[in-house]
C-alpha cells in the first residue's frame, strides 16, 4: 500500500486456519521498500458476525486524507463470501468498520464455488 509518500506492507495473520482470530496487520517500509520501520500495527480483526471468523483480501484506496480499507469476510469457498469497508485517517489505523457491512454480498453458491 502507498499513501502517496510512504510504502506499507499489509498482511493477514491466518488465525482462522487454527481456530483463532483472524487479523490484518500493517507495517511501514523504508524508502527502498526492502526494510521495515517500527513495529507492525493490527489494523483489523474479525469481530462482526457476517465475517464468520475471517477477514482477508484487503485493498486500500486513499481519498483526500482518508484511507478506505476494503476486505473480504466469510472465506472465498463459501456462498457467504462478502466485502466490507473500514475507514481511517492513518494508514496504520485505527480503522472503523462501516456499520452497514457487508457492502457487497454473495447471493449465489455458483458465484463463490465456480472453480
Model regions and ranges:
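Carbohydrate-active catalytic/glycan-binding domains of CAZyme proteins
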Residues: 1-115
